[in-house]
């Protein structure tokens, strides 16, 4: 299990754009599961939507991409590099995510070719699918 600080040791995201609170499982270069506890204090709820707070779908996808980043950037040869979101296919939103929900973020690598990987990504709340997509991730340059 990785806490927020350990996640930040792997991926370059920081507040307010770090959207993963914990990593529960990492299976080498194959799979990872993360958690995002969605609170009423999230800044995006101020405008999305007043009186009816719903987590923006693009941020759910970003949270999934960050879990993908933990898989790819956790590899020794990629330490210190940046991960780039390179594509999305078949994205579907099936459930609204609201304050008080806990997002379970699961990514499984389905194809790896050099610095580019594809993965099946699923975000769930209480076992219900909130979002699913196929993501493409690319390894970028080292950052300082």
UniProtKB/Swiss-Prot annotation:
Gene3D superfamilies with a match to the protein in the record: Hotdog Thioesterase
Catalytic activity: a (3R)-hydroxyacyl-[ACP] = a (2E)-enoyl-[ACP] + H2O
SUPFAM superfamilies, alphabetized: Thioesterase/thiol ester dehydrase-isomerase
GO molecular function, one term: (3R)-hydroxyacyl-[acyl-carrier-protein] dehydratase activity
Compartments in which it is found: Cytoplasm
Covalent S-S links between cysteines: none
Active site, per annotation: 48
Location (main, coarse): cytoplasm
Example GO biological process: fatty acid biosynthetic process
Nucleus listed as a keyword: no
The enzyme's E.C. designation: 4.2.1.59
Keywords: Cytoplasm, Lipid A biosynthesis, Lipid biosynthesis, Lipid metabolism, Lyase
GO cellular component, one term: membrane
A Pfam family hit: FabA
Broad enzyme group: lyase
InterPro entries membership: FabA_FabZ, FabZ, HotDog_dom_sf
Domain of life assignment: Bacteria
Job of this protein: Involved in unsaturated fatty acids biosynthesis. Catalyzes the dehydration of short chain beta-hydroxyacyl-ACPs and long chain saturated and unsaturated beta-hydroxyacyl-ACPs.
Family, as annotated: Belongs to the thioester dehydratase family. FabZ subfamily.
Name this polypeptide is given: 3-hydroxyacyl-[acyl-carrier-protein] dehydratase FabZ
Source organism: Bacillus pumilus (strain SAFR-032)
Name of the coding gene: fabZ
């Amino acid at each position: 299990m990785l806490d927020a600080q350990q996640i930040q040791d792997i991926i370059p995201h920081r507040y307010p754009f770090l959207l993963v609170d914990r990593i529960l499982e990492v299976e080498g270069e194959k799979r990872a599961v993360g958690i995002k506890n969605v609170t009423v204090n999230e800044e995006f709820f101020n405008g999305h939507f007043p009186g009816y707070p719903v987590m923006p779908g693009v941020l759910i996808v970003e949270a999934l991409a960050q879990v993908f980043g933990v898989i790819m950037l956790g590899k020794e040869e990629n330490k210190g590099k940046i991960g780039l979101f390179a594509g999305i296919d078949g994205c579907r939103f099936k459930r609204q995510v609201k304050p008080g929900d806990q997002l379970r973020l699961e990514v499984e690598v389905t194809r790896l070719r050099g610095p580019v990987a594809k993965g099946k990504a699923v975000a769930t709340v209480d076992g219900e699918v909130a979002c699913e997509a196929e993501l493409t991730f690319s390894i970028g340059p080292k950052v300082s």
